[in-house]
Design a protein with these regions (language model features):
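Cell-envelope/extracellular polymer assembly enzymes that use nucleotide-activated donors
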Residues: 4-6, 38, 190
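Short, well-formed alpha-helical segments that are part of the catalytic scaffolds
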Residues: 14-30
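Donor nucleotide-sugar binding loop of glycosyltransferases
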Residues: 14-17, 46, 75, 101
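Conserved donor nucleotide-binding strand/loop of the catalytic core
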Residues: 37-40, 51-85
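A conserved acidic beta->alpha catalytic loop
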Residues: 43-52, 98
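Acceptor/aglycone-binding surface of glycosyltransferases and processive sugar-polymer synthases
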Residues: 69-85, 90, 102-185, 211-220, ...
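Catalytic donor-sugar/metal-binding loop of nucleotide-sugar-dependent glycosyltransferases
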Residues: 156-157, 179-183, 192-209
Length: 242
């Protein structure tokens, strides 16, 4: 079976973490069975040396591509940018901190193939024994409350929409992401909602996960995110996902 893969890494001020992340991902890809693979780093207007270290790594790893946003647009914008440029038949987006180890991709791939799903996404909620390092209690509790809002406003049954480890059939991803409206925290909810609306099959998969220091989600943006499930519902009512 042909296995063609793109990996999108949204990056904002990831100068310190990015080299190790790229080393681990490219090493994994070289040892795997992918007939074609590429890694797309999407810089979101970083103020540090993110682009420089990505370019330095690319000098010895031509499979790495670098895209740059017009300023700081948000994680959702970055992921969409990468998804629309992906060349593989399947595209994974992964957080730059590899809070879900890249090796967990095999679980998503297997689940997608067995269920014939176009979307397979990592979940911390289906098997919490797979969480090595938990978030602080307040953040973890807020995440559970956020999921309640997601289920109430969108009607989706998923227990964790926010894990930054999602695999898409690229053909489906282009249809999903071109309809995306949210550019920051809540985009995960939105793209899963759009996928269901368009009739694509999505499967939630338990994956290993560790909380990593240096989160880019601040208190204000985190509170604002609680409105995103409502925004998704409003966009749906206005016909923006047609």
């Amino acid at each position: 079976m042909t296995r063609s893969l793109s990996i999108v890494i949204p990056a904002y001020d990831e100068e310190k973490r990015l080299p190790g992340t790229l080393e681990r991902i490219t090493g994994y890809l070289q040892s795997g069975e992918w007939t074609f693979s590429e890694v797309i780093v999407v810089d979101d207007g970083s103020c540090d040396g993110t682009v420089r270290v990505a370019e330095e790594f690319r000098a010895d790893a031509p499979a790495v591509r670098i895209l740059r946003n017009p300023g700081n647009r948000g994680k959702g914008y970055s992921v969409r940018h990468g998804m629309m440029e992906a060349k593989g038949e399947w595209t994974l987006f992964s957080d730059a901190d590899l809070s879900s180890p890249i090796e967990e991709l095999e679980k998503l791939w297997k689940a997608a193939q067995e269920s014939r799903a176009q979307v397979a996404f990592g979940s911390r909620a289906l098997d919490r024994s797979l969480i090595g390092v938990h978030q602080p209690l307040l953040r973890e509790s807020a995440g559970k409350l956020f999921n309640v809002a997601v289920r109430v406003f969108t009607g989706m049954p998923f227990l964790d929409t926010q894990c930054g480890f999602k695999l898409f059939e690229t053909k489906a991803a282009r249809e999903i992401f071109r309809r995306q409206q949210l550019e920051r925290f809540g985009f995960d909810v939105e793209v899963l909602f759009i996928a269901r609306k368009l009739g694509y099959s999505s499967i939630e998969v338990p994956v290993r996960w560790n909380d990593m220091a240096g989160t880019k989600v601040g208190t204000v943006s985190g509170l604002s995110a609680f409105l995103d499930p409502l925004r998704v519902r409003m966009h749906q009512l206005k016909g923006k996902y047609r």
